[in-house]
Amino acid sequence: MMMEHEMATNRRPRAKRTPGDKLGKGGGDAALAPAADAEIPASSAPEPAAPISAPPAPVIKPVGGDAWASLLSGSPWSSPGAASPTEAALKPVMPSALAEAVANAPPEAAPFTELVSHWSPPFRRQPDREYEEINPAEAAIPVTAAAPEPEPEPVPEPEPEPEPEAAHDHAATETEGVTEMMTSDVELEIEIASDVEVVEAPAVIEPSPRPQAFSHSTAYAYPAEPAPAVETAAEAAPAGPAENPVKEVPVEDLFTGIFNVADSAVRGAIGASTDLLRDPKSLGGKLSVAGQSLVHSIKGRFNALLAPRHGAKSNGDEF
């Protein structure tokens, strides 16, 4: 108990160690005195944090001679910090294996359009169209509509000139002078002929010329006019209605006559059949008698029907 009390009394309070404190010569148990040179900041505001630079992009190494991967890894646009001038100035170094792979790579095939334009015949190629350059100043000028052409004025027709009266008078005087000269010449010829002896010459009878109306030229040129038709009294009279040779018979009378004829024919056939059964030898005579009676009955029926139409009495023999 006494030992513990002494140890408690010998202990001294230790201050909290700060980064600026220095260790004493007595080791860890020695008291750390605060530094007299420590400057106390005037303001209590915290200092601004230093900017943290982005980590550099990982470099992709080519695997198995991949040329495209190495080119993309060294491209300045593939890294996130490509804006910095230090990283943009860095250039990738192509290894020898990659250079050999690029040199030995087969050439890429040209596109289809280039092959067609190269191997196609020259006459099938269409030349490029040349367009004239449009002057903006000329293009800005508005185009005005063409002025309508004036219609041609109608040419007035020249009026007929009136004939002068002096011309008629001059022509009349000329004709009068000519007639006077002709009459004087005729009188001189008559006087000369009276002085000379007259010798009678035999008269020559010339055939009269064919009249012009009967010449061949006029016959073909002017067709002969047809002679006017003379209408007779019979033709001028109006034609009456033609007589119809077939007489009109009422339908009722026609049907009654047909039924009567059929009735008599049936009765005659029945009587002939009964007589044939009774006496087969007298069949011929009875048939002739029955036929005659049938014919007479038919005639009588039709004469009776046609008698009112003719307006006269008809005997049984008339049909």
Swiss-Prot record:
Changes seen on gene knockout: Single gene deletion, no effect on magnetic response, the magnetosome chain or MamK filaments. A double mamJ/limJ deletion has wild-type magnetic response, but forms large gaps in the magnetosome chains reminiscent of the mamK deletion. MamK forms bundles in these gaps, but the MamK filaments are no longer dynamic.
GO cellular component assignments: magnetosome
Origin superkingdom: Bacteria
Region (Disordered) residue spans: 1-59, 145-176
Entry keywords, A to Z: Biomineralization, Magnetosome
Compartment(s) where it occurs, according to its Swiss-Prot or TrEMBL record: Magnetosome
Chief location: other
Compositionally biased tracts (Acidic residues): 150-164
GO BP annotations listed: magnetosome assembly
Stretches with biased composition (Low complexity): 30-52
Written domain comment of the UniProt record: The center of the protein is Glu- and Pro-rich.
Reported function: Regulates the dynamic behavior of MamK filaments; paralog MamJ also promotes MamK turnover. At least one other protein besides MamJ and LimJ is required for MamK turnover. Might connect magnetosomes to MamK filaments.
Entry's family note: Belongs to the magnetosome MamJ protein family.
Remaining remarks: This bacteria makes up to 20 cubo-octahedral magnetosomes of about 45 nm in diameter which contain membrane-bound crystals of magnetite (Fe(3)O(4)).
Name this polypeptide is given: MamJ paralog LimJ
